[in-house]
Amino acid sequence: MRATSASFVTLVILLSGIAAAQSASPPAMDPNMPGMAMPGKKPVTKKAGPKKPAPRLPAPQQDAMPGMTMPHDGQPAPPHHDMPDNDTRTAEKPSQEMSHDMPGMDMGDTGHDMTMHGLLGGYAMSRESSGTSWQPEDASHSGIHLPAGDWMVMLHGRVSGIADWQSGPRGGDQVFSTSMVMAMASKDLANGDTVGLRAMLSGDPLMGRRGYPLLLASGETADGTSHLVDRQHPHDLLMELSASYSHPLSQSDSVFLYAGYPGEPALGPSAYMHRVSALDNPMTPIAHHWLDSSHIAFGVVTAGFVHDDLKLEASRFTGREPDQFRFNFDTARFDSTALRLSWNPSPNWSLQVSHGWIKSPEGLDPTLDERRLTASATYFKQFDFGSVAATLAVGNKHLSDGTDENALLLEGEYKPDPDWTVFARGESIESKELLPGGQIRGAGEISLGAIRDFRLAEHWKFGLGGLYAFDFAPSSPTASYGSAPHGAMAFIRLVAE
């Protein structure tokens, strides 16, 4: 309980600093000013006719935190205004148009909300998610904008207090806290290139090395001597410290370089805590280590090429998972490789397929290498009855000892209005770590939950939520899960955005 209280106090102090800094920024102007050109910063606008987007011009202002997908408010994107006399970059997709109403987004001295180009190319910034991954462009972002000269700075933070209960001999109960504070800064150079910086910190290590009870979860180690089984490990204090540089080649093409220590390689879908289909779900997917467990890698370099709605990228990164020491930097090895192809066929869809060759991911099995294949489809759409987000993902791990393990995930969120969110997830995994000397096949989990948010102030909201999970696991004495394993969580959440 002492660690949980310390985590809450630390993160609330950090979030208070964010809000205090924002309150000192100049007042916003009236956002309803069609045709208004932003001083020194140029938005992505829509031009009539079939003409392709013009090349980027320097210093456009941006509306989101690339690589840090923020909770969407469930509201439809507002209408745009054509700006025929403005010679800034144009975009053909509706999701890349000028926006005038994104709740929680204060554009500081301009008073305007913009959908701007991404850090890695000439598409809408709302397409960017964790690392260099993509999400549907229609999924909105929110965050706090702070003016910083020629730089655009965005901040976001959240802290949750969770009461967890997992049934049976392999379960347990615990009260703990999870948290993240994220920052992004970007600048467009005179030649049209874009520089981006990102940082993400977490107070999770304060919960203790062993993490929290979660039936059927496995991966990494808590003490350096044994695998963590039926528990979810905490994230490292340092989740991301990265930089990116992109250069436009033409109206629709660009190349980019991304480096992080730690960072996220081009492997898997967006990390679960940033996925638009899982933003409000406090439970870590049990398929995490088949899909997106490499999202914290101590040493990543990614090079990529973007052509309109396609992105091809390759990463060289450290394959070893973070060790049990959650407050330090791990050794950078750059011994593993990943390739990913992403395609956004429409503003509502984001697809990816990726393949990773991972060297010695587990410190307890240093001679065991892994080939990982993932494929996923993420969907987001605003309807008259609310917004819907969903992800379908599959993952395969082929280990160098011949073991072959698969995982399947289907998750979603429904927001009937900005205050309520209902979320659900279904998963199936194959794992030898859950049963020493054998392999559990067909294990799975189905969870359902909801959260009610209350707006406290312009940049603050507080939520109350809960979920219930039904687990499917072998009932043999060696498995020891019992006949009907299940679990539940009750949680509170404070968000600065």
Where are these regions (language model features)?
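Outer-membrane beta-barrel "beta-signal"
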Residues: 448, 482-497
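Surface-exposed coil loops of outer-membrane beta-barrel proteins
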Residues: 208-342
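N-terminal periplasmic/intermembrane-space "pro-region" immediately following the signal or transit peptide
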Residues: 21-158, 162, 171-172, 184-192, ...
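Outer membrane beta-barrel transmembrane domains
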Residues: 355-364, 387-402, 406-413, 417-457, ...
